[in-house]
From Swiss-Prot:
This is Dol-P-Man:Man(7)GlcNAc(2)-PP-Dol alpha-1,6-mannosyltransferase. Mannosyltransferase that operates in the biosynthetic pathway of dolichol-linked oligosaccharides, the glycan precursors employed in protein asparagine (N)-glycosylation. The assembly of dolichol-linked oligosaccharides begins on the cytosolic side of the endoplasmic reticulum membrane and finishes in its lumen. The sequential addition of sugars to dolichol pyrophosphate produces dolichol-linked oligosaccharides containing fourteen sugars, including two GlcNAcs, nine mannoses and three glucoses. Its EC number is 2.4.1.260. It is found in: Endoplasmic reticulum membrane. The chain crosses the membrane at residues 1-21, 60-80, 86-106, 133-153, 172-192, 198-218, 259-279, 284-304, 309-329, 339-359. Disulfide bonds: none annotated. It comes from Caenorhabditis elegans. It comes from the Eukaryota.
Length: 492
């Protein structure tokens, strides 16, 4: 492996270590992986999804794969009695490294197609941007699909179009049905140009049908067993989002939000270099245009999240990397080109500064995770006592998962909508808020039977501050108390 390839691996691990928590959108895959690792598949009543099924079901294919790949190290962890919280880092590292290797696989095809310098800059650019590396280890359906998407891009660059159809079909059927919006424009172009055959046994349609049938033959029996009813998860997701059009229940954004907000935040200062790459290499427009069309088509869905378009970030960065490589190669030909080359270096440094701030914020954005961890650390000598802990919905959504239930003698309760009077017998309460009213709520509802043990500060917002001294303008990160642990007054 080359030096910049190792940088991708190292940066991925750094992100995992500094921001180990998970949030509500990752909940199903995290909990399912935990249950597969610690419970027999014949004992589904102990599985988290049996108690908290969520709005739409998700496939178990991803968690099963993650549990199997993590099992050798998991066995070692258990043999040495290492707390299972560390196995959360293990599964995230496993997923992150799978995505890192898929990206490096794609980067090597860029090396063969565009040159060594372009591949080097592609890896460096991706390492200096926060969101792609951050999401690579997040147990999300998008992240499992991302592995296959990178393989699809690699196969397309190598001219292995039929193989690309196979991986594309699998990613759509198993993980993210909306990826058809990405693959449609891509494969349509290859079909029109005659590089991808449409009909016949080896045509795109026949290959897609065969792979879809194979994926359904795997997904439906497995997921039907775990969910206890006949089920194709992505089919239900598609019905929920497209037919019922209920995704707006999770919030909406303006039509162009991906273009003016999400992409600039993902690409950071690299945004300025993407169009320049399109100007210096005629091959790039046909590669980049389908990604633009994908984002445009996806914009019709009212509910928007940055992670929904994470797949196409390497394509935009490829365009920027081509420009950076040209500046590196031609830097000695003129003074102007030397200036542009230094601009390329400065843009990487600017990305690193922004990513450092994002990573700092992310490390303090999981109050539920921090609260339960510190509670268990403070009471580590009571690990074998029958302690009861109540975890409210806000903390459950901001980091608490079954990997954090490290004391077998403790009872962790996440029952929703309990009244304050129902909580008086719990030894500890782990409570959170999404606003700034935590202390007020504690003082008005819970002080009769419990007293605050400690509060957890978490990221609230950032502001742009102005100063008369250098650097004149800088971001200020503001933290507020987002979680509290209360201790029963009768607990000894």
């Amino acid at each position: 492996m080359e030096g910049t390839e190792w940088i991708v691996i190292i940066v991925t691990i750094i992100h995992i270590i500094l921001a180990p928590g998970t949030k509500v959108e990752e909940s199903f895959n995290v909990q399912a992986t935990h249950d597969l690792m610690f419970h027999l598949p014949t004992n589904l009543s102990n599985y988290d999804h049996s108690q908290f099924p969520g709005v739409v079901p998700r496939t178990f294919i991803g968690p099963i794969s993650l549990a199997i790949l993590s099992s050798p190290m998991s066995f070692i962890f258990r043999f040495w009695a290492i707390p299972k919280m560390w196995q959360l880092l293990l599964i995230r590292a496993t997923l992150g490294l799978m995505n890192a290797m898929a990206f490096l696989y794609f980067a090597r095809s860029v090396n063969r197609k565009f040159g060594r310098e372009t591949a080097m800059y592609l890896r460096l650019i991706m390492c200096t941007q926060f969101h792609y590396i951050f999401y690579m280890s997040r147990p999300l359906p998008n992240t499992f699909a991302l592995i296959l998407v990178m393989i699809v891009f690699e196969r397309l660059l190598e001219g292995r179009y039929e193989s690309a159809v196979r991986y594309a079909t699998a990613s759509v059927i198993l993980f993210r049905c909306e990826l058809v919006l990405l693959y449609g424009p891509i494969f349509l172009g290859y079909m029109i140009s005659g590089r991808l055959k449409v009909f016949g046994f080896d045509g795109a349609i026949a290959i897609g049908v065969r792979i879809a049938a194979m994926c359904l033959a795997v997904s439906i029996p497995i997921d039907s067993y775990f969910w206890g009813r006949p089920l194709w998860p992505e089919g239900e997701v598609m019905f929920f989002n497209v037919v019922e059009n209920r995704s707006h229940e999770y919030g909406t954004q303006p039509f162009l939000w991906y273009f003016y907000s999400a992409l600039p935040r993902c690409l950071l200062t690299t945004t300025l270099l993407v169009p320049l790459g399109l100007l210096v290499d005629r091959r790039l427009p046909q590669i980049v245009l389908p990604s633009v069309i994908f984002i445009f088509l996806y914009s019709f869905l009212p509910h928007k999240e940055l992670r929904f378009i994470i797949y196409v970030l390497p394509i935009f960065c490829l365009s920027a990397a081509v420009f950076c490589a040209r500046m590196l190669i031609n830097r000695h030909k003129s003074f102007f080109r030397m200036i542009l080359f230094f601009g390329v270096i400065l843009h990487l440094l600017a990305n690193v500064l922004c990513t450092g701030m994002f990573l700092l914020v992310a490390s303090k954005n999981y109050p539920g995770f921090d609260a339960l961890n510190y509670l268990q650390f403070q009471n580590r000598f009571d690990a074998k006592k029958p302690v009861t802990v109540y975890i409210d919905n806000a903390c459950a959504q901001t980091g608490v998962n079954r990997f954090l239930h490290i004391n077998d003698a403790w009872t962790y309760n996440k029952t929703e909508n309990l009244k304050p009077a129902d909580l008086e017998n719990f030894d500890f309460l782990v409570l959170g808020t999404y606003g700034n009213t935590l202390k007020t709520e504690v003082e008005s509802k819970f002080v009769t039977w419990h007293r605050p043990l400690f509060f957890v500060n978490s990221f609230h917002q950032y502001k742009i501050k102005k100063s008369r001294q250098f650097p004149w303008i800088y971001p200020e990160i503001i933290y507020t108390e987002k979680a509290v642990v209360l201790k029963n007054r009768n607990y000894k």
